[in-house]
Structure formats: C-alpha cells, structure tokens
Amino acid sequence: ECTQNWLSDLKLRASWGINGNDQIDNNATYNLYYTNMSNGSYNFNGDGTTVLPEVQKDRSGNNDLKWEETKQLNFGIDAAFFDNRLGLTLDYFQKKTTGMLIQKPYIGVIGEGGYKWYNAASMDNSGVEATFTWRDEIKDFKYDISFNLSYYKNEITELPDVIKYTWGGGNGVDKTIVGQPYGSWMSYKAAGVFKTKQEVYEYLSKYDVQIGAPGVGRIRYKDLNGDNIINTADMDWQGSDQPRFIGGLNIGAAYKGFDLSVSVS
C-alpha cells in the first residue's frame, strides 16, 4: 500500500542464451584455386599457339571450422510511476564471443594456399542501457519526452600468436590489440609544436629522430619508451572508433488533429 501513490508498475527481467554466427564464405572449408596466365602457362598439344593458364592454390580449406559462439546474459527492469506518466527501462548485458571466424595473413612458408579461415579470436562486450520517458496531457494538448543513454565496453581478449601483434592494428612487434576495444588505432603522441629554432635544435640534440622532420610549427613527438629514439616503437593505442556512450532525445506533441515529433541522437 505504501507504493500505490507513486509506483504504477514494476517488472524484473533476466535471460541467458547462446547464439551462433557462420557469416563467412560458403566455401571456407574447401581448397580454393584460381587460374593465372602471368605466372605460368602451358602448351599441351605442342603446336606452340594454344596456351592454357596454370592453376594456383590460393586458400586452404579448414574442415574443423565451426560457428562462432556468443553467450549473453541480460538483466532488466521496467518500471512506471505516477499513473504511468514516468517510465523507466534499465538493461544490463554481458556478451562473450569465442571462436571468432578470422582469416589470418598469408602464410608464405607453406607455399601455395597460404590463406585459411580459423576459429581463432575471442571478444567481450558489456554495457548498460537506460530509457526515461515522461508523458502527460493538458486538456487537448498531449506530449511525451523520452531520453535514452547507453554505455558500452568492448575488449578483444584472445588472438592466436601468429597474428597477435599484427591483427587489428598492432605494430607487428610488441603491441597487440588484445586488451583493447575492437576498432582501436595506434599513433604517435604529441607534446605540442616547435615554436622556435632553438627548441628544434635542442630536440635534435637529445633524440635520434627517425620519423618526421622537426621544424618550427611542426609537431613534437613524445619518446614513449625512453630510448632517446623517435621511431615507430613510440606509437601507442590512442583510441577506438567504437563509442563508449550513445544518447538520444525524442520529443512528441499533439494538439487535436496536429502532431509534431523531434529526434536528436
């Protein structure tokens, strides 16, 4: 009885499930060949005029391929207050994807057929989604306002050693996207710009600069690993093209036979 004056409805939700994904080439389990005239051709009938192309193996099939597997856990709340004028929807989700289907870079040591599909990566996703709605009416005028906000977190959790430092933008040596969000990118970190020739001289006296050309008005790069050398080893993860926060606002109004709606995201 103590909630009747303000709580109109309350629902709790929970779900768990497993989904699969097989979105790769239909022929990924088969060896793939193609014809090539430039690297080799043959004259089988001996007349010296009829030339047939050679056949090269481009990709090796993988009979052990299986679907990606995504386990997802969801918790949710649906609530309404003040005679259903105020609404709240809140969701939390957690997704773990294993056996992601990826094609490794060409493996030259095996000769022909160096491309191959594998179940070889894992990724975690989690987030919170909230929607707040207010709706009311004043005589013939009705209106509703809805605001939604979402927070997402993504992380690559596993890659095979052969592509650990190259797939997804790694530097190929010692920095890997494992532990970073999908869509991450690497770059140099700036420490301002050179304002005078004296600053340029001092910078060149201190560092062995192997990238860029220091000069007045140009970017000064940081020596991240402290070896007094400015090179590709000083690149680091700078961010991701995957947004952490997403929000939107929807406003609707109606008066007699007229209505108006506005959406912003």
Question: What do these predicted regions represent?
Answer:
Residues 1-2, 14, 75-79, 90, ...:
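Residues on the lipid-exposed face of transmembrane beta-strands in outer-membrane beta-barrel proteins
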Residues 2-68, 87, 91-123, 176-178:
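Solvent-exposed loop/turn elements at secondary-structure boundaries
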Residues 8, 69-73, 124-128, 141, ...:
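Residues that define the transmembrane beta-barrel architecture of outer-membrane proteins
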Residues 16-20, 92-98, 134-136, 149-155, ...:
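Transmembrane beta-strands of outer-membrane beta-barrel pores
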Residues 26-29, 33-35, 137-239:
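Conserved small-residue
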Residues 55-61, 110-116, 131, 172, ...:
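Extracytoplasmic loops and strand-loop junctions of Gram-negative outer membrane beta-barrel proteins
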Residues 84-88, 128, 140-141, 257-262:
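Repeated loop/turn-to-beta-strand initiation elements of outer-membrane beta-barrel proteins
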Residues 144, 240-265:
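Conserved C-terminal beta-signal and adjacent last beta-strands/turns
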